[in-house]
Amino acid sequence: MSPLRVEHSHYVGPVSDLSHKDLLATEPGPPPTLLPEDPAVAELADNGRERFLEIVSAHPTSSLCWALLAEGSLKINSPEGNVGAYAYARTGYHRGLDLLRRSGWRGSGPIPWEHVPNRGFLRSLYALAVAAERIGDTVEQERCLQFLRDSSATAFAELTGQSQVTESSSGDRPQ
């Protein structure tokens, strides 16, 4: 006969019904957050050049669309382009934060680059760091780069061309 578990004086089944999780194992932190597919991606792939602004307008919550606008503005490398890039990147960043929270993210934990739908947010975050540097906001630049490092070592390496000096932390980010 298997032992019984009791919670609040209610029978909840035999102990054998418990998962066989290693109770001595330590969890490294919150689980990775995986964003849902971005509907703008298919449209951009099919006819992004011809209909780019139309697609952005149709998908204002797409971090990828805002990241692409920011990256394009950064290529101009002028005061106007840099300010525009900052605004576009900040929009993509905030749209991404909204979606991350709806996907269970609680302000910390990995946001893996390897999961393609996460890339729009991560690209917006990096573009925000670059644009912040160009307009002289080094505090914002450093905050964004640290957030990127904490969220995804792979994204940091891919986007900056640098490798991590230290292992990625748990992804804690005050918001």
Placement of each model-derived feature along the sequence:
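N-terminal alpha-helical interaction modules that lie
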Residues: S2-S103, E133-Q175
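Amphipathic alpha-helical repeat elements characteristic of tetratricopeptide repeat
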Residues: D46-R49, R119-R123
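Solvent-exposed loop and edge beta-strand segments that line ligand/cofactor-binding
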Residues: E54-A58, P112-P117
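Start-of-helix signal in alpha-solenoid helical-repeat scaffolds, especially tetratricopeptide repeats
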Residues: S63, H115-L122
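Acidic, Ser/Thr- and Gly/Pro-rich intrinsically disordered linkers and low-complexity segments
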Residues: L100-H115
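Acyl-donor binding region in acyl/amide transferases
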Residues: G120-Y126, R134-T138
